[in-house]
Amino acid sequence: MQLADDPSSIDKNKYTEQLLALGRNSGLHQVGVASAEVLHRARQALNERKSQGLHNQMQFTYRNPNRSTDPTAALPSAKSVIVGALSYSTQMPEQPEKLSARVARYVWSDYYAQLRESLRQIAKQLESDGFRAVVLADDNAIVDREVAYQAGLGWFGKNSNLLIAGAGSYFVLGCVVTNAPLVVADKPVEDGCGSCRRCLDNCPTQAIIAPGVIDANKCLAWLLQKPGVFDRDFRVALGDRLYGCDDCQEVCPPTVRFEKRTSVIADEPVKHDDRANAWVSVQKILLADDESLLKEFGAWYIANRDPKWLRRNALVILGNIGDANDKLVVELLQKYCNHGDAILRSHAVWAAARLGLNHLLPVSEDDEIVLAELRALPSVK
């Protein structure tokens, strides 16, 4: 007979702790349990921000708030949600070469694959006991940060990330939705930010418009993923970022303290650890073919699986960090100022003009996207 055959015989406290211990032993740094009830607070926030246009076409959990805030959408018989946090805290290594683009920490390695495997260990135990279990990680089906908050793992920082007491926000989160009757957290963690506003003050585009509220229209992490023309107002602020932006976490006191305690030493030579993926060659992005780029960066979110958006980002970076006297920079911009794709050509035009390489600009042009870029050049700073 399995435990699920007679739920009334289960010692909920003992069984819950066994599952949490299994999660910790499987590599999770933090694990807790929340109710499978509708996440009303998150649903209201998603709907309000969507109606205000703060999502800027972003889909993910915004696509269907009624689904992403209801664990029973994933499992109709759900009673509990186990949520786990896996740390990816690692200090940023020095830039290896001058034409290198920065990558956010959470994609230095496939942390979500590690997270899923840990969550699957919990799910397997539940299933062997006769219960149902659905693993959700990096999934639009659930607002995992809100579940983690309800489970008592941490509080919402002013940068909207979940902050775990004594550890900060460098964590990926995932859930196991189950029909097992478990002991849920009795109350959330109290706010630990106090009067601190470092994340608000240090956001390069002032995208944190109020404590816990992000305007995706300004957020570099989203603008780097969003297809189309990269907003001119934020190109200079992009700096050398190719994918993601960690600025609001890099200044967060609990995150910084935890990183210093747990990370490998930043000035050790990068060998085969995750830090080897912290920087990407701009030259590689602009010269590699589609197949090679998707093979190397296919785990990233790339709109329509089109590496063009990586190249677009790389061209903006080239305009920000390139040297007009560098032969390679000139050759790359010359190549893309004559590229067949208008989106890429327009961003190369911006980069060339920013570096004062006006002789590379197209003499004749009939595409409206590029023409709009050329008309905007006097405002480029």
Label for each model-derived stretch:
Residues L28, R198-A221, L238-D267, L332:
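Iron-sulfur cluster-binding cysteine motifs and their immediate structural context
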Residues S292-E296, A324-C337, G356-E365:
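Amphipathic alpha-helical scaffolding segments comprising HEAT/armadillo-like alpha-solenoid repeats
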Residues Q225, A303-D306, K335-I343, V363-E373, ...:
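Short coil turns that connect the paired helices of HEAT/ARM alpha-solenoid repeats
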Residues D274-K308, R312-V329:
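Alpha-helical adaptor scaffolds
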Residues W222-A237, P253-E296:
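A beta-strand-loop signature enriched in Asp, Gly, Thr, and Trp
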